[in-house]
């Protein structure tokens, strides 16, 4: 299969690689149907992610169809359309049990996909801890609609959630890129008194003005 691969600092390359196989009873193999590029992928390319392993397939924002599951997987089955969580996590360590899955102590835990183990800029991906890392997509939701759930939208949701926003608050969001817009959308659900977005790109400013006229820039 074709896989977009981190070769070395400043270099990615499309390579031919073997299709992934089940390694653990809790794994699933997913056929990728749609993916996107995260800024973190660019951070890897530019050498800002020291844990990134040369030779790894990059990518951690994707949706797909389950092709195969390990014997211990119970929440999904072959044929299911699924989102893939950016964080793989065991669900059992101290951090997982307290909700901080990004700090999972398992060797395949935390931000592993597309950084320390092969990610989703490929035709297929192996997802460890599939019961925690995969979520079925309803038939009424398209791949395009579900794509951001696993990372960029979840990042915006988490930011809005931990900020404990009230209806009396003024909220400042720095940046109106994809993550900033997702954060804006999730912040709007909290109905604060005022939302301010700080952005220097004229194109992004125009986008916010066009789609979110009540937001201050």
Predicted regions and their residues:
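Residues that mark the start of a beta-strand
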Residues: 2, 27-29, 170, 194
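Cysteine-cluster motifs in flexible loop/terminal segments that predominantly coordinate metals
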Residues: 38, 75, 86-135, 139
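Cytochrome P450 core scaffold surrounding the K-helix E-X-X-R motif
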Residues: 40-46
